[in-house]
């Protein structure tokens, strides 16, 4: 806690400015150019500790919303993509229920489906299992393992070391705002 891991994700997503250095996402530099920042945000999905689902909307409506607002998809197109992504994370049968009717693990899978429905090139995860009961952690990690097997580029802040070893190509260890060690999982 407090080592700067979440801040790094905010830098990558262009939500905070760096003091030095350069971040490149899919060949596009993340700099002071507002247009670049907006374009990069369209290509980056984010999974947070808290699920940030709208409580007054069904699961399907939550997953549809950003597709229709940001990607300008029709409701029909959004629904097709939403159902595909809800199926991918194993929760399509809950499309017409409200977030309060779901477990924490189910809500996190809906949040991941919502991010994936935007067809990001990179997924950022900020401790996606930290707010979950121990029995719910596995179902979220399984979804993330599937994404890794499919080749999704991911940056994941996690305390789940076994998971990190299993799915990572590269690991960064941080302490007190500094990168202490980097390398392959080997």
Spans of model-derived segments:
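ABC family nucleotide-binding domain
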Residues: 1-185
